[in-house]
A protein has these predicted regions:
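Active-site-proximal inter-transmembrane loops
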Residues: 123-148
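Membrane-anchoring alpha-helices and their flanking helix-loop junctions
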Residues: 2-126, 130, 154-208
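Hydrophobic, membrane-inserted alpha-helices
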Residues: 147-155
C-alpha cells in the first residue's frame, strides 16, 4: 500500500513537472538554436561573430568577460532548476513566463535577421559593420539584448527560485552595462547617423 502511494505521488509529481520542463526546454532550445545557428552561418562566410573580450581597454574587457560569465553561468542554473523542479510560483504565472520566453525568442530572431552579417557578440575590434535602423531596430536600439532579457525573465517565472533569480538579475545588469559600452562605440563609429537614430528610438523599446 505504501509502495503504491509512493508511486502515485511520484507519478503525480512527474506529471506536474513535465509540462513546464518541456515548455522551458523548448523556449531555451529555440533561443540557442537561433544564436548558434546564426553564428555558424556567419562562420561559414568567414565572419567571426563572437568577439567578446577582443578589445584591450580594461573597462570594456572586464564588462565583456563578466557578460560571458553571466550568459554562460545562467544556463546550468536554469537546467538545475528544471531538473529538480525548483519553482515557487503558481501555474498561471509560469505559463505567462513561457509566453514571455517565446516573445524573447521572437525578438532575438528578428534582431539577428535584421542585422544580417553585421551581427556580433561583443564589440568588434576591427570588423567594419553597418548601422541598422530598420525592421525591429526602428522600435528598439537593442532588440537582441531585449530578447535575452525577455527570455531570462520568462524562464525565471517558469522556475522561480533564489538561484535562478540571482543569475537572472546578474545577467540583466551586466547586459545593460554592455549596452552602455556599445552605445559609446556606436556614437564614436557612426557619429551623427547614430545620434539622430538615438533621438528617435528608445534604448529598449519604443519611439520618442
Amino acid at each position: 500500500m505504501i509502495g503504491k502511494e509512493c508511486f502515485v505521488m511520484f507519478h503525480s509529481d512527474f506529471e506536474e513537472k513535465l509540462p513546464y520542463s518541456v515548455l522551458t526546454f523548448v523556449a531555451l532550445a529555440v533561443f540557442y538554436a537561433i544564436y548558434f545557428g546564426k553564428m555558424l552561418a556567419q562562420k561559414r562566410r568567414g565572419i567571426r561573430t563572437r568577439q567578446i573580450g577582443s578589445w584591450k581597454e580594461k573597462s570594456l574587457h572586464t564588462i565583456e568577460l563578466l557578460m560571458s560569465v553571466a550568459t554562460l553561468g545562467i544556463v546550468p542554473a536554469q537546467i538545475l532548476s528544471i531538473v529538480f523542479g525548483l519553482s515557487c510560483l503558481p501555474g498561471g504565472v509560469r505559463f505567462t513566463g513561457f509566453l514571455i520566453a517565446l516573445l524573447g525568442d521572437g525578438i532575438f530572431l528578428a534582431a539577428v535577421l535584421c542585422m544580417r552579417d553585421s551581427w556580433r557578440a561583443g564589440i568588434p575590434a576591427q570588423d567594419k559593420t553597418e548601422i541598422v535602423t530598420t525592421g525591429i531596430y526602428a522600435f528598439s536600439r537593442n532588440p537582441a539584448f531585449l530578447g535575452f532579457d525577455f527570455m531570462y525573465i520568462g524562464v525565471l517565472l517558469l522556475y522561480c527560485n533564489p538561484l535562478t533569480a540571482a543569475f537572472t538579475a546578474f545577467a540583466i545588469v551586466i547586459l545593460h552595462l554592455q549596452i552602455l559600452q556599445e552605445e559609446k562605440y556606436m556614437a564614436a563609429t557612426f557619429g551623427a547617423t547614430y545620434l539622430a537614430y538615438r533621438k528617435k528610438v528608445l534604448r529598449y523599446l519604443g519611439r520618442k
